[in-house]
Design a protein with these regions (language model features):
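Short acidic, glycine/proline-rich loop/turn micro-motifs
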Residues: 1-3, 74-77, 139-142
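Short, contiguous acidic/charged loop-to-helix segments that flank catalytic cores in large enzymes
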Residues: 1-6, 79-84, 106, 146-151
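Catalytic-loop motifs flanking and including active-site residues across diverse enzymes
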Residues: 5-12, 45, 89, 115, ...
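His/Asp/Glu-rich mid-to-C-terminal helical/loop segments that flank catalytic regions of hydrolases
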Residues: 11, 18, 22, 135-179
């Protein structure tokens, strides 16, 4: 069924796009919104994109990946790896948690294994966000009845705020190699 993996990420992407549309936000840097396919087959969509970028590679500063963001737990933990791949990223992602209703669990490294890894391996800063694993992962039981819609809204708002903050970063956004 794929409700969490990864209809939840697509839903977050659409919510964030809608928020940008309504807010009329004009960030300092451009933002490319994209949804990849064939992640399970070896990150084929993200690999193709990185190998055929529509802009110069040095113009791509940070990739934020939302994969499995629909099952926010009772502790409201939003996990992310790769926050240390750009300057002050860990601090920013933690600070964005203040007043968000979420408890960000932020790792400088631990980049993970989803589409953002393709960017990281090509020296582009990358953060992967998720709300945690569950027994329904990669099973037909990954159904909409188990999605935490209110949690998904909190996660989408957090990611929107992260995008705006990163796009308006005053300092240069440079790649920092992690583990």
């Amino acid at each position: 069924n794929g409700a969490d993996d990864n209809a939840s990420g697509v839903s977050a992407l659409l919510s964030i796009l809608e928020e940008f549309h309504h807010s009329k936000t004009a960030p300092k840097r451009s933002i490319i919104f994209i949804s990849f396919s064939a992640e399970e087959e070896g990150l084929l969509g993200s690999k193709y994109f990185v190998n055929h970028l529509p802009v110069a590679k040095n113009a791509v500063k940070v990739m934020i990946n939302m994969d499995m963001v629909g099952r926010l737990n009772d502790k409201k933990e939003l996990y992310m790896g790769g926050a240390g791949t750009f300057p002050d990223g860990v601090e920013l992602m933690k600070k964005l948690g203040e007043g968000s209703g979420l408890n960000p669990v932020v790792f400088a490294g631990d980049v993970g294994g989803s589409d953002h890894v393709t960017f990281y391996k090509n020296d582009i800063s990358a953060i992967g966000l998720h709300t945690g694993g569950h027994p329904q992962y990669h099973t037909p039981e990954d159904d909409t009845a188990l999605i935490n819609s209110e949690g998904g809204a909190l996660v989408s708002k957090y990611i929107y705020n992260a995008l705006v903050s990163i796009a308006n970063y005053e300092q240069p956004l440079t790649f920092i190699k992690q583990n």
